[in-house]
Curated annotation (Swiss-Prot):
This is Uncharacterized protein C4orf51 homolog. Residues 74-117, 181-208 are annotated as: Disordered. Residues 184-208 have a biased composition (Polar residues). It holds the Pfam family DUF4722. It comes from the Eukaryota.
Length: 208
């Protein structure tokens, strides 16, 4: 009965099914099995601990690791921006006196402040750009937008318009030439008809 209850511990009983002697026997067997399992895991070549626990590094690797430990730690140095002058004028950049004093840092917007949101935004923009940039009004922006010098050029559109104007000029020239030739041809035809009528009239008189 006790062995059955030990194999099925989910059965709830109001008393303990194991005596102290049986419990001690189970504890000793479990300890022995755990020691055997640990010993096998440490000595077997199919486990990680058995394969790599006693492995020693070669001499070259040991020397390289020793040199790496003796080297100073990497020190971060900020890379200057392409416009170094603009980078130096920014307040609070790394390495400056303002950054050391903590004057050039951005304000903590999350913390309560006496300034209004507009003043905070103005301060942030001022610290980013270094100087207050005047914001153009709507009329000034519209004037800049409508001015021809500010409009971007479209080379494809301009090329198309030039070809269109050339085509119109060529058509006009051909039309004038066609009108001139048609007028010249009509005048020659009228002169030929007049000459033929005169010739036929004179020949008729001779035969009479």
């Amino acid at each position: 009965m006790t062995h059955f209850l030990y194999l099925t511990p989910e059965i709830l009983l109001p008393f303990s099914p194991l005596t102290s002697t049986e419990f001690e026997l189970i504890r000793r067997k479990a300890q022995q099995l755990w020691q055997d399992e640990t010993r096998w895991s440490a000595s077997s070549m199919t486990t990680y601990s058995g394969s790599y626990r006693e492995k020693q590094l070669d001499e070259a690797t040991c020397n390289r690791l020793a040199q790496r430990v003796g080297q100073p730690q990497f020190e971060y140095k900020p890379t200057p921006l392409p416009g170094s002058s603009a980078y130096n004028t920014l307040p609070g950049h790394a390495g400056s006196q303002e950054a050391a004093d903590g004057k050039g840092r951005l304000p903590d917007i999350a913390s309560p402040s006496r300034d209004s949101p507009l003043n905070i935004k103005h301060k942030v923009a001022h610290q980013i750009w270094g100087s207050e940039v005047p914001c153009p009004t709507f009329l000034a922006y519209r004037g800049l937008r409508m001015s021809p010098c500010m409009q971007p050029k479209k080379p494809g559109f301009e090329l198309l318009m030039s070809y269109r104007n050339r085509g119109k000029a060529l058509l006009k020239r051909l039309q004038r030439q066609w009108d001139y030739e048609s007028k010249l041809g009509s005048s020659e035809d009228s002169g030929t008809d007049r000459f033929s009528s005169n010739t036929s009239g004179s020949s008729g008189r001779k035969f009479k």
